Regions:
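Conserved, helical-rich catalytic subdomain that frames metal- and/or nucleotide-binding sites
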Residues: 25-74
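ATP/adenylate-binding site constellation spanning eukaryotic-like Ser/Thr protein kinases
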Residues: 7, 17, 26, 50, ...
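Short, glycine- and charge-enriched coil/turn segments that flank and shape catalytic ligand pockets
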Residues: 17-19, 37-47, 99-106
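A short local loop/turn or secondary-structure capping micro-motif enriched for an aromatic residue
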Residues: 11-14, 29-33, 88
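Structural motif
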Residues: 3-5, 21, 51, 77-79, ...
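Solvent-exposed alpha-helices and their adjacent loops that cap or buttress functional pockets
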Residues: 5-6, 14, 45-46, 70-73, ...
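Conserved catalytic micro-motifs used in adenylation/nucleotidyl-transfer and phosphoryl/amide-
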Residues: 1-16, 22
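C-terminal catalytic subdomain
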Residues: 55-81, 85-132
Length: 132
């Protein structure tokens, strides 16, 4: 498997032929609102406070991080991405591009193009790995 640690609102996704699963949990105001049932996940995508994070890396080297173990089989993918991608590309678009793409580099190019077309800021970052 793969060990993933996160803080803030960058995400990790496990992608297989069967679907896409978000591994990490955002440390954000809207994620807390979704957890409490105040808003839906879809409403969170458009919420005016969606970029307010409750934890972040900064000058203080000690950060309260969450850790996850993701079992992975050969041929499966791990996508690490910033909120610039998450806020503009849907999970289903990510799944489609990764599964039907032509290798990790081409998939990332297509995902970044979709994000730009949907109005993403310049700070869209993503890494896609396929387990051999």
């Amino acid at each position: 498997g793969v060990v993933v640690t996160n803080v803030g609102d960058s995400r990790a996704y496990h992608i297989t032929e069967d679907g896409i699963t978000r591994i990490t949990k955002d440390h954000s105001l809207v994620e807390s609102m979704v957890d409490r049932g105040d808003i839906t996940a879809e409403e969170a995508r458009r919420h005016h406070s969606r970029n307010l994070i409750t934890r972040a890396l900064g000058p203080d080297i000690s950060a309260d991080c969450d850790g996850y173990i993701c079992p992975m089989n050969a041929g499966e993918y791990l996508l690490l991405c910033s909120d610039g991608l998450v806020n503009t590309v849907t999970d289903q678009e990510m799944l489609f591009e990764v599964i039907h793409g032509d290798g990790p580099d081409t998939c990332l190019d297509r995902l970044l193009a979709i994000a730009k077309r949907q109005g993403a800021p310049d700070n869209v970052t993503a890494v896609l790995m396929q387990k051999q």
